[in-house]
């Protein structure tokens, strides 16, 4: 057993894993297990750069180096324009990403980073699913509570955490700040696995395990994923859909509150013109209004979440137009330039 895991017990894999848990939306620092995420980001940056220098990792081609420089100077410009030091966090993370990419290139372009990420998401999805079944069976209770970043209570169950635990309803957030975050990053893991790693076991475990997030967005994104990759294999689509529905019904059948809380989220809400579980459309509309008011350079990342903006436009949480509202057209170009 030890012989199988010994190749992974080295600094490189520690660096990979630390990059997954160093900061928000992971909650380890909120539970007091790690320093504040800003400290973790600096530590991650120093460790990644030190590894690159000590191992003398090779350089990227000039176009890639130029892209990194444009982004770095672009965010410095935004920090000065908006008087916002949070843009320096982006620079640190950008340079850290650059360093980790160089490490992977030095390893012959291996997929070790992607594989490690996929396994980490599978662990959260499956352990959370097991934990939820134990909670619903009355065999598991919260070990302790902690305060989430938005000041709501979070619950640590040992196998998973969640910010949704009331009235018989419990959802798996893994070790992220909310179930939707686990579902969001889980979809990334699915796509990475399908396109590069191609591990069928990982794919099945992710698809089934992420059901425990009970995220409406997950099921919408999963439907798109299945149509893109399995549209020519109708029997697989039917089989996967059947497994998902049976698993869902099994989980939600434990109590009436959970059943209505989940299936009720797919009911049409006439007051909003969308399904009851849609909690992003309003946020997207607000951010789109802000973008229309500040189209070129945006409002600034920190300004966007200020009380003044909340009183004028309403609360703006994570959504597709958040970065557009914060950074405008110029910021969007800088962000998506590597694509």
Model-derived features: where do they sit?
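Hydrophobic, aromatic-rich transmembrane alpha-helices
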Residues: 1-4, 43-58, 186-195, 331-339
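Interfacial loop-to-transmembrane-helix boundary motif in multi-pass membrane proteins
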Residues: 12-14, 66-71, 101-149
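N-terminal signal-anchor transmembrane segment
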Residues: 1-57, 72-81
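Interfacial juxtamembrane loops and adjacent helix segments
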Residues: 138-171, 303-320, 325
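Hydrophobic transmembrane alpha-helices and their immediate junctions
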Residues: 63-66, 197-200, 223-231, 235-239, ...
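Alpha-helical transmembrane segments of multi-pass inner-membrane proteins
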Residues: 118-144, 161-214, 218-231
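A membrane-periplasm/extracellular boundary helix in multi-pass inner-membrane enzymes
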Residues: 80, 133-136, 230-271
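Long extracytoplasmic/lumenal interhelical loops at the membrane interface
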Residues: 27-33, 256-330
């Amino acid at each position: 057993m030890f012989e199988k895991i010994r190749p992974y017990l080295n600094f490189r894999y520690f660096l990979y894993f630390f990059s997954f848990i160093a900061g928000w939306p992971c909650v380890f620092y909120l539970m007091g297990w790690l320093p504040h995420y800003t400290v973790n980001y600096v530590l991650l940056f120093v460790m990644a750069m030190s590894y690159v220098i000590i191992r003398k990792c090779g350089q990227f081609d000039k176009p890639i180096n130029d892209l990194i420089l444009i982004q770095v100077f672009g965010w410095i410009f935004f920090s000065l324009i908006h008087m916002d030091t949070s843009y320096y966090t982006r620079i640190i993370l950008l340079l850290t990403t650059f360093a980790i990419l160089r490490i992977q290139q030095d390893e012959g372009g291996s997929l070790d980073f992607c594989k490690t990420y996929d396994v980490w998401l599978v662990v959260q999805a499956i352990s959370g699913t097991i934990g939820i079944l134990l909670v619903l069976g009355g065999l598991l209770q919260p070990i302790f509570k902690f305060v989430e970043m938005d000041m709501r209570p979070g619950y640590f169950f040992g196998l998973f955490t969640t910010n949704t635990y009331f009235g018989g309803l419990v959802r798996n957030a893994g070790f992220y700040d909310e179930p939707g975050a686990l579902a969001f990053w889980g979809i990334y893991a699915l796509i990475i696995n399908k396109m590069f790693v191609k591990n069928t076991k990982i794919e099945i475990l992710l698809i089934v395990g992420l059901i425990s997030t009970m995220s409406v967005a997950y099921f919408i994104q999963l439907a798109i994923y299945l149509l893109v990759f399995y549209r020519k294999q109708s029997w697989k689509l039917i089989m996967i859909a059947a497994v998902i529905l049976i698993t869902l019904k099994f989980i939600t059948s434990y109590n009436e509150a959970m059943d209505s809380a989940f299936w009720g989220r797919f009911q049409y809400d006439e007051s909003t013109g969308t399904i009851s579980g849609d909690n992003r459309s309003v946020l997207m509309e607000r951010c789109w209004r802000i973008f229309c008011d500040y189209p070129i350079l945006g409002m600034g990342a920190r300004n966007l979440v200020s009380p003044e903006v909340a009183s004028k436009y309403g609360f703006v949480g994570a959504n597709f137009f958040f970065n557009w509202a914060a950074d405008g057209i110029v910021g969007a170009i800088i962000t998506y330039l590597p694509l």
